Regions:
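Hydrophobic transmembrane alpha-helices of multi-pass small-molecule transporters
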Residues: 65-68, 180-184, 214-218, 292-295, ...
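Transmembrane helical elements of multi-pass membrane transporters/channels
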Residues: 22-41, 142, 153, 176, ...
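Short runs within selected transmembrane alpha-helices of multi-pass transporters and secretion channels
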Residues: 74, 143-162, 169-177, 202-218, ...
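Helix-terminus/linker motif at the lipid-water interface of multi-pass membrane proteins
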Residues: 32, 36-54, 123-130, 186-197, ...
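Small-residue hotspots at the loop-to-helix junctions and early N-terminal turns
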Residues: 50-61, 136, 140, 203, ...
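Short alpha-helical transmembrane segments in multi-pass integral membrane proteins
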Residues: 1-27, 81-148, 194-251, 308-374, ...
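Small-residue-rich hydrophobic transmembrane alpha-helices
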Residues: 53-113, 150-169, 269, 280-346, ...
């Protein structure tokens, strides 16, 4: 009679924890640096007046649209490349990077041309304010030239991350941060003999920092990296048709999921935008807190994604299951810590913003809702994206998000708003999916049907 093997909920494989830390730390630092770049931009441009701030914000919405599309390409690259990395199949990884680069350049080129040809029309879709449109057009027509450079650097960073080289992204982002902040100060306000350029200076600083970021990524990939050893000819060679089909098949639902999330984000802003300016300010403050805490959650989830893809690609199903159980326990702990962190500093955090007392009161209420919702986010997001999606079931997250967004989140928030509910109640409706998805995640993850080897 054989004895059933006891399930292990916390793996004793020390390499899991070492790899998790080695990947999560630089990815989280890269996210923090990216956050710092945006924060520095907002801080400096805010001194130019409301129209300039609004113009930059609206201009950046076009760039955000490209970033969402690129997230789909980058995630597809990471999932497929990580699984082939588990097999140490560098030939297939290079072909995946080639496909990603072509897709990224196509998206970047289309978005760039649209922004250059129809800048005021695109800004006009977002706001009727003529002064904001004028400022946004100035900014967008300069920043648009950076879109191609951005796509190249993001694909290279994603490729390096998939083969467990996450530090390169952090280092490249740090270079971009230094360049961006330095040039912002020099060009916006005029320094070292350079005339003050205002919003044009902010746009030029962003463009130059993107060029430097792209150049650093290319130099690293071509002359420093020893794992992939990329060459220019790798991007122009013939690609296996079956691999190209896999890229489209598994990438399409990921891209669709990003589009759904973009619609969700814009609509949520519109719902809260119908309340008073104090509520809108409170929502902005809560958004800053979300971005801050999401840095480490996303970094850890990205690390789990690489580990999962590599282990699935190696064919060790039992180890994947063991890692999945450990991941669930670990991120429950992360959720408790994150919730406690938000609740602990919310009173101090709202005082950093020069807003009315009413806005601070709303913000404090929103942060309580956010703290509770982050309990769910910290569990379901790493489980569904870091395990299920990276493990091979790339379409499930798209279907799950679509159902929750269009059948639960937006309808409940719209109804609550229409009935005159308190803003905090509406905000809770907008965040309720983060808790509800935990039920789905528990069932989906522990059935293990998501473990699919996508390699050939």
């Amino acid at each position: 009679m054989t004895t059933a093997k006891k399930q292990v909920w916390l793996t004793r494989d020390r390499s899991f924890y070492r790899t998790l830390a080695a990947l999560a730390l630089p990815i989280s630092l890269q996210n923090l640096i990216t956050f710092a770049v945006g924060f520095a931009d907002n801080l400096m441009v805010s001194q130019l007046g409301d129209a300039a701030v609004s113009g930059v914000y609206m201009g950046n919405q076009i760039q955000t649209f490209l970033q969402l599309l690129m997230t789909g390409v980058v995630q597809t690259t990471g999932i497929l490349a990580a699984q082939y990395w588990g097999k140490r199949d560098m030939t297939s990884i290079k072909q995946i990077v080639c496909l990603s680069m072509r897709a990224g350049l196509a998206l970047g080129l289309i978005t760039m041309l649209a922004a250059l040809i129809f800048p005021s029309q695109l800004i006009g879709l977002l706001t009727p304010d003529t002064e904001v449109i004028a400022e946004g057009t100035i900014y967008l027509t300069i920043v648009a030239w950076s879109f191609l450079f951005y796509t190249v650097s993001q694909i290279i960073i994603a490729a390096m991350r998939s083969v467990e080289n996450a530090r390169v992204g952090m280092n490249i982002s740090l270079i971009a941060l230094v360049v961006n902040i330095s040039l912002n100060y020099i060009l916006i306000f005029g320094w070292l003999g350079v005339p003050a350029m205002g919003i044009r200076g902010a746009a030029i600083a962003t463009l130059i920092s993107r060029v430097v970021e792209c150049a650093a990524a290319i130099v690293y990939a071509r002359w420093i990296d020893k794992k992939m050893n990329l060459r220019l000819r790798d991007f122009f060679g013939r690609v296996n048709r079956l691999l190209a089909g896999d890229f489209l098949r598994y990438g399409a639902p990921i891209m669709a999921g990003e589009i759904v999330w973009a619609i969700n984000t814009v609509t949520q802003s519109g719902i809260l935008g119908h309340f008073s300016k104090e509520v809108i300010s409170a929502s902005s403050i809560a958004g800053n807190m979300h971005n801050l805490v999401y840095i480490w959650v996303r970094g850890l989830a990205s690390a789990v994604s690489v580990i999962t893809g590599k282990t699935v690609g190696s064919g060790d199903v039992e180890r994947v299951k063991e890692y999945a159980r450990t991941t669930q326990i670990f991120f429950i702990g992360v959720g408790i810590f994150t919730c406690s962190f938000i609740l602990g500093i919310r009173g101090l955090f709202v005082t950093f913003f020069a807003v009315s007392d009413a806005a601070r009161a709303y913000a404090a209420q929103f942060l309580v809702v956010m703290a509770i919702s982050m309990l769910g986010t910290c569990y379901q997001m790493p489980c569904l994206s870091g395990l299920v999606k990276a493990g091979g079931d790339t379409s499930f997250v798209f279907k799950n998000d679509t159902i929750h967004v269009f059948c639960v989140v937006l309808p409940s928030a719209l109804i609550a708003s229409h009935l005159g509910a308190h803003p905090a109640v509406v905000f809770a409706c907008l965040k309720c999916d983060q808790i509800l998805k935990c039920i789905v995640a528990v069932i989906k993850v522990n059935r293990y049907k998501w473990i699919r080897n996508l390699t050939r």
